[in-house]
């Protein structure tokens, strides 16, 4: 259950309202806030948009590793490296004084990367278990937007040349049809 479904059953949720106009963001945040929805505001619209795409890519990576039976320790290292990779990309594409440990960045990445309700993690798990991209998409009957986000960020990064080994691995698996087992093994050498 991700944010939308949790809000429907009144589970505690946290939302960040991103807007270049702080007054408007505060107005919207006040209107959305409730006993079970906590809100905050940010002016980092582009950074939050990029991180929202990247978290889906990293959730696919986490799912692939899960499907390949990598353990919890490896998953933690993968996500730790994903946070660093996201920060490098954000600081290059949209330099701003931001803290990627804030819930809008890290929290969103963690829930999408670890939740069994995440479409992107589920898609990645299927790929890791040997499904083709097409067969995983058909069986899921939902859109794993990270599939498209991977290609989009890869194209943007051609102009910025940020070191993004996790993005590159996911791209190679999804679009170049490199074996997940081989590509993730290669990725392990670049993780710290």
Predicted feature locations:
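Short, conserved glycine- and acidic-residue-centered signature motifs
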Residues: 1, 79, 146
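Single conserved hydrophobic/aromatic residue that forms the stacking wall/gate
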Residues: 1-9
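Alpha-helical elements of the RecA-like P-loop NTPase motor core of helicases
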Residues: 6, 26, 121
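Internal alpha-helical scaffold of NAD(P)-dependent oxidoreductase catalytic cores
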Residues: 12-99
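NAD(P)-dependent Rossmann-like dehydrogenase/reductase catalytic/cofactor-binding core
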Residues: 55, 62-70, 91-192
């Amino acid at each position: 259950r991700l944010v939308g479904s949790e809000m429907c059953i009144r589970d505690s949720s946290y939302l960040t309202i991103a807007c270049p106009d702080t007054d408007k963001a505060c107005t919207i945040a006040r209107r959305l806030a409730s006993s079970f929805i906590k809100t905050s505001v940010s002016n980092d619209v582009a950074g939050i948009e990029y991180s929202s795409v990247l978290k889906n890519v990293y959730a696919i990576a986490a799912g692939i590793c899960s499907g390949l039976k990598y353990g919890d320790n490896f998953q933690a290292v993968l996500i730790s490296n994903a946070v660093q990779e996201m920060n490098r990309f954000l600081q290059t594409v949209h330099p701003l004084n931001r803290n990627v440990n804030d819930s809008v960045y890290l929290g969103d990445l963690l829930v999408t990367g670890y939740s069994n309700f995440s479409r992107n993690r589920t898609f990645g798990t299927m790929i890791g278990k040997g499904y083709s991209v097409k067969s995983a998409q058909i069986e899921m009957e939902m859109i794993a937007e990270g599939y498209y986000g991977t290609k989009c960020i890869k194209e943007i990064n051609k102009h910025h040349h940020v070191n993004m080994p996790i993005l590159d691995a996911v791209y190679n698996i999804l679009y170049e049809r490199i074996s997940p087992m081989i590509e993730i093994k290669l990725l392990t050498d670049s993780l710290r």
